[in-house]
């Protein structure tokens, strides 16, 4: 199964509370943090919610 590499590129300080919670759920705390998650619909939905704060790329 492929994986997603998710990197936070913008701060979550001046965002909606649910966006901050989504960043925390993904395991992102500060700009430049990167996590590797399985490519599942749940994670893609979270990334879609905060797409203006993160970048995503597929890795094997």
From Swiss-Prot:
**Electron transport recorded as keyword:** no
Single GO biological process annotation from the record? translation
Q: Which residues form the signal peptide?
A: none
Annotated Gene Ontology cellular components are: cytosolic large ribosomal subunit
Which keywords does this Swiss-Prot/TrEMBL entry list? Answer: Ribonucleoprotein, Ribosomal protein
GO terms (molecular function) for this protein are:
structural constituent of ribosome
Q: By its UniProt entry, which SUPFAM superfamilies does this protein fall under? A: Ribosomal protein L30p/L7e
Q: What intrachain disulfides are recorded?
A: none
Task: Say which domain of life the source belongs to.
Answer: Bacteria
Keyword Manganese assigned to the entry: answer is no
Recorded hits in InterPro entries, A to Z, give: Ribo_uL30_ferredoxin-like_sf (IPR036919), Ribosomal_uL30_bac-type (IPR005996), Ribosomal_uL30_ferredoxin-like (IPR016082)
Q: How does it assemble?
A: Part of the 50S ribosomal subunit.
Q: Name the protein family.
A: Belongs to the universal ribosomal protein uL30 family.
PANTHER family the UniProt entry points to = LARGE RIBOSOMAL SUBUNIT PROTEIN UL30M (PTHR15892:SF2), MITOCHONDRIAL RIBOSOMAL PROTEIN L30 (PTHR15892)
Q: What is this protein called?
A: Large ribosomal subunit protein uL30
